[in-house]
């Protein structure tokens, strides 16, 4: 179990429970961003107007029926190309296991703040794993309306169970099994996306680290009720640095995607996993697969919890750059070569060099 002093910002959970009517100014978004924030995301999620996040049925992803398999592969490729994010259904991970993961995470955040503080991270010392309220320096310098728990969950030899919650008792077994099954699903998805680029099916997995070096990390995001949701964000606009990101949530809306120059609210689809294409695959595919800008909204009425699992390449071993097969005279490389660590630094400390991977924020 890791202990450390809490940082200067109070836990958002404590702010929410204090009965305040207005949020501290450190949580208020910049003026130019406020005009796009919806105060009632719960009502917005019920709207059927505008574009809708695609739902991909994976039931026939490995089917012996060639027609069904090809149809599934094409739909997955199209969603990765057009949106870069999708709902996955019939993904093969048992509903009972997902329910256990959600229950364990919810129970952890229901513990008294004092108990959770025993798992607090120490960002000043470079230790981001554990319980916290701000993962890293973000783009705006503003605080986000969330607390979180962040840790490496796979492969087993790279995890540190000493920092995992021991309460509730099912947290470690449920999370470990979920990470293992999600890692296997990632292999299947990467195979389909490789084929979609005209590559051998194992190519993308190899390029992001393979069985030994691809790191799987989980961030449980806890978004308390917010008295002024029209002024705050749970997670500011960003793209994921990962190869793939898989997200569960407690069926409370909040995720928005920046699609066709406007913010689109993701629906709550039962028994689905949301999957994002991350920057890593966008770079390797030379932009053919999209890493979409997205953000998390909060609301007055309900606590929102999400479980984001990031599949990431090793920081220094691999140089990320467009694969030769994705480049031509007509489509020259859109991204400069960088290690994953260099890409992380590039993202965290703002992009000021006019790269083609720069994305709008609002």
UniProtKB/Swiss-Prot annotation:
Names of required cofactors: Fe cation; L-ascorbate
Cofactor: how and how many bound: Binds 1 Fe cation per subunit. Binds 1 ascorbate molecule per subunit.
Active site per the UniProt annotation: 304
Residues engaged in binding Fe cation: 238, 240, 294
Domain Fe2OG dioxygenase stretches: 214-313
EC numbers, comma separated: 1.14.20.4
Location of the region described as Disordered in the Swiss-Prot/TrEMBL record: 1-23
Keywords tagged on the record: Dioxygenase, Flavonoid biosynthesis, Iron, Metal-binding, Oxidoreductase, Vitamin C
GO BP: anthocyanin-containing compound biosynthetic process; coumarin biosynthetic process; response to molecule of fungal origin
Catalytic activity: a (2R,3S,4S)-leucoanthocyanidin + 2-oxoglutarate + O2 = a 4-H-anthocyanidin with a 3-hydroxy group + succinate + CO2 + 2 H2O
GO MF assignments: L-ascorbic acid binding; leucocyanidin oxygenase activity; metal ion binding
Pfam family, one: 2OG-FeII_Oxy
Family recorded in the similarity comment: Belongs to the iron/ascorbate-dependent oxidoreductase family.
Protein name, per record: Leucoanthocyanidin dioxygenase
Native source organism of the sequence: Perilla frutescens (Beefsteak mint)
Designated gene of the protein: ANS
């Amino acid at each position: 179990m890791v202990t450390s002093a809490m940082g200067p910002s109070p836990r958002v959970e404590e702010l929410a429970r204090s009965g305040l009517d207005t949020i501290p100014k450190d949580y208020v978004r910049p003026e130019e961003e406020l005009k796009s924030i919806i105060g009632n995301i719960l009502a917005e999620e019920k709207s059927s107007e505008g574009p809708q996040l695609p739902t991909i049925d994976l039931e026939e992803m490995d089917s012996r029926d060639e027609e069904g398999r090809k149809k599934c592969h094409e739909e997955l490729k199209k969603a990765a190309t057009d949106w870069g994010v999708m709902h996955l259904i019939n993904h093969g991970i048992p509903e009972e296991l997902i329910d256990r993961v959600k229950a364990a995470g919810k129970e952890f955040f229901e513990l008294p703040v004092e108990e959770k503080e025993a798992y607090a991270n120490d960002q000043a010392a470079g230790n981001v794993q554990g319980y916290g309220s701000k993962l890293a320096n973000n783009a705006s310098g503003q605080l986000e309306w969330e607390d979180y728990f962040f840790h490496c969950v796979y492969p087993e030899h790279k995890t540190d169970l000493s920092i995992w919650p021991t309460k509730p008792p099912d947290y470690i077994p449920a999370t470990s099994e979920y990470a293992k099954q999600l890692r296997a699903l990632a292999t299947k998805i990467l195979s389909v996306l490789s084929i979609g680029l005209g590559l051998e099916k194992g190519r993308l997995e190899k390029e992001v680290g393979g069985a030994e070096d691809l790191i799987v990390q989980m961030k449980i995001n806890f978004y308390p009720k917010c008295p002024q949701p029209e002024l705050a964000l749970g997670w500011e606009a960003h793209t994921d640095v990962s190869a793939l990101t898989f997200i569960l949530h407690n069926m409370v809306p909040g995720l928005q995607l920046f699609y066709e120059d406007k913010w689109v609210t993701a629906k709550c689809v039962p028994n689905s996993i949301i999957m994002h294409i991350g920057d890593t695959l966008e770079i390797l595919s030379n932009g053919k697969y999209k890493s979409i800008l997205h953000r998390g909204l909060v609301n007055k009425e309900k606590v929102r919890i999400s479980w984001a699992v990031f599949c990431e390449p090793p920081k220094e071993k691999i140089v990320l750059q467009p694969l030769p097969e994705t480049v031509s005279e007509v489509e020259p490389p859109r991204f400069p070569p960088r290690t994953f660590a260099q890409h992380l630094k590039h993202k965290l400390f703002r992009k000021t060099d006019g790269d083609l991977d720069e994305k709008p924020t609002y």
